[in-house]
């Protein structure tokens, strides 16, 4: 009886927190902590930008001499519906819950059963979405796809035929940062966890006595000698490729990258329910997702030669 009550509790737990859980599912990817997020995108939405220049002129005489320019540009962000469908056999679920309840009784687990299931699935969705934001090419176009398709995006190569020197990769990425990128504010180097750990290990290996050792567990570090440049690891670049060549770093001002979604629309959902006919507990998440880059010419990508 207790297990049956708990299965009902799973649906109740989700029903009471649908909006909160959907937001956590969609917004939990770490890249979204720093890039621009555009909400309420149903299908397509324009990204409108104005680039203005003014000219100072001699005002010692009368007259009108119009000068300067206002350049309007527009890029479209397009989102696609993404779904997660899962199901669990009610009998198997009850067996698992009984074992899990023993762990709770022994103080080896603290979360209620229904919260544990939802929490683990949220983590899995967040991890999958983190990769999709950068690498997706089927359901929607990830950021690397946008970069590869735009001729104005700067794709630079690094010769890894003799192996990857992470110091060289980061230094090359740093050397490619333009004045326009600096003018936007803080510049971010997005790198894979492998590049991040490799670079920190390399820096720590030559660490002098008066410099603190860098903790590889840090969410980000700054480039030595330039606090304007942040180096940030992302699982989204793990195993990433452009044209079958490894991607080592993507450099830009973080808000130049855009993720579009819609977590409040009626077509989006986060739901768990029990199907008595099939004796299955079903799990559904539905949301929109898509990416775009405001100014591709202000993105530098370092990839394998």
Cite the ranges covered by each PLM segment.
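Helix N-cap / beta->alpha transition motif
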Residues: 89-100, 190-195, 234, 251-254, ...
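Ordered core of a single globular domain
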Residues: 168-206
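Short coil/turn segments at secondary-structure boundaries
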Residues: 133-138, 185-192, 212
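Sequence/fold signature of self-assembling virion shell proteins
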Residues: 2-55, 60, 149-161, 165, ...
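Short loop/turn segments at secondary-structure transitions that flank enzyme active sites
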Residues: 92, 127, 195-197, 289-291
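Non-transmembrane, amphipathic alpha-helical segments
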Residues: 76-78, 113, 281
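Alpha-helical scaffold segments that mediate packing/assembly in large oligomeric complexes
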Residues: 99-176, 302-305
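Acidic/polar, low-complexity extended loops/arms that serve as protein-protein interfaces
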Residues: 23-98, 127
